[in-house]
Amino acid sequence: MNDATPPADELFVTQFLVVSDQERSRDFYQSVFGAAVVRDRDPVILALANTRIVLNVGGGPTDDKPTVRLAPPANPDVSSGFLNLRVRDIAKAYRDWSARGATFLTKPRDHGYEIRAYIRDPDGHLIEVGQTT
């Protein structure tokens, strides 16, 4: 599927992230997670595993959201949502993604039902990396 192709099913979920620098964010998701570029900019669209991530600068309001302004996180320590990446081997993801430039907040922690750790992207968006146990 490219960015103009409608989904084969009735619903296809994408994650939209407001970023301050499209190129920097695109490079981060490509180098750390191996995301493939579907569209280069305005907005950047990346294919990652079985979904798409859309990266665009803030702005607004617009005619279809007349009271809404989009902006990157003002405070990375306050979050109302996050990207959740599920992996088979969190130790491998931690090792590989750290080597590619990801900075984890902590080493993976075992919570009984899952082992998880968190990364921040260049704008401070929180990314959970989790392995179900």
Regions found by a protein language model. Give the residues of each.
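Short, basic/low-complexity N-terminal boundary segments at the transition from targeting/disordered tails
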Residues: 11-27
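Vicinal oxygen chelate
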Residues: 1-14, 36-85, 92-120, 131-133
